[in-house]
Amino acid sequence: MVLEATMICIDNSEWMRNGDYSPSRLQAQTEAVNLLCGAKTQSNPENTVGILTMAGKGVRVLTTPTSDLGKILACMHGLDVGGEINLTAAIQIAQLALKHRQNKNQRQRIIVFAGSPIKYEKKALEIVGKRLKKNSVSLDIVNFGEDDDEEKPQKLEALLTAVNNNDGSHIVHVPSGANALSDVLLSTPVFTGDEGASGYVSAAAAAAAAGGDFDFGVDPNIDPELALALRVSMEEERARQEAAAKKAADEAGQKDKDGDTASASQETVARTTDKNAEPMDEDSALLDQAIAMSVGDVNMSEAADEDQDLALALQMSMSGEESSEATGAGNNLLGNQAFISSVLSSLPGVDPNDPAVKELLASLPDESKRTEEEESSSKKGEDEKK
């Protein structure tokens, strides 16, 4: 296994926004760099990898050579895109970072991802290449994008020729297409190195060729932490989607329930209104009838019947009084002995001198005497009052 310190130069220029490499040049490059860092650190525990960017406001070192893969991958997030790459300055700064490596036994290697046009002339690039060769620094170049630029491959080939010593440097031209940038690089010397593919690279290539054999295309035997992180992330996303779907279903059910409640309330109000309308109709009818009676529009037959009953009662009352007076007059006549005696004497066959008739007449009260007594008693009462 080769003990090596590597600096990877990333192209973050404006051309990385293009989508000729899925999903974009920058994303495809980032995936390839992540896989390359894993291959380097897994091939030898003492290998170190550093990252720098070539565009933007200037060349910027994201991390110096380190064996901490987590630190290397973390510095790749949130890259700024813009400007043009400064290839010669980036190579010189990468060489300086390798010169200050902690383990001097490590071989030095620079890997350049060039996805945008090269503005430098061949002569300037050859000068930089010769300097690398003098300091025993190997160079790998990944040329992608700008397929119609014929000068770009020639410039990069000239740079590689100036650096190459014992075929320790390599260049890979990756045309745009359906294949991912990382998948193409897996079988190239950039990944496999001069001594053949390591176990990590071979397993990664097998996973890329048959990614459906493992969850998320990652073999848990090679990188269990990555496989676990991907699985946890997928479970969290699934739980979030299920919660969102459940919430949407609950909201839809609540809306339907509210609609049914509103419909039932409207029906209840309508029924109550109909029920209340009937008594009001009756009250209105009674009110109309009372008004009609007050203006004389109602049939007064019942009142006429009551008047007839009242007249009949008055007539009966007066008849009773007349009968009482007649009875009183009759009683007065029967109480008069002279009248009875004259009546009996006028009857044929009746002898007024008969003792039985006389006894009967004697038993009758003398009305005249009673009248005189009443008059005398009334006079005495008047005298006493005086």
From Swiss-Prot:
Taxon lineage: Eukaryota, Viridiplantae, Streptophyta, Embryophyta, Tracheophyta
Similarity section: Belongs to the proteasome subunit S5A family.
Domain VWFA: 5-190
Protein name (database record): 26S proteasome non-ATPase regulatory subunit 4 homolog
Cleaved signal peptide residues: none
Gene of this entry: RPN10
PANTHER family: 26S PROTEASOME NON-ATPASE REGULATORY SUBUNIT 4
Gene3D superfamilies associated with the record: 1.10.287.3990, von Willebrand factor, type A domain (3.40.50.410)
GO molecular function: peptide receptor activity; polyubiquitin modification-dependent protein binding
Protein's organism: Arabidopsis thaliana
Bias-annotated ranges (Polar residues): 262-271
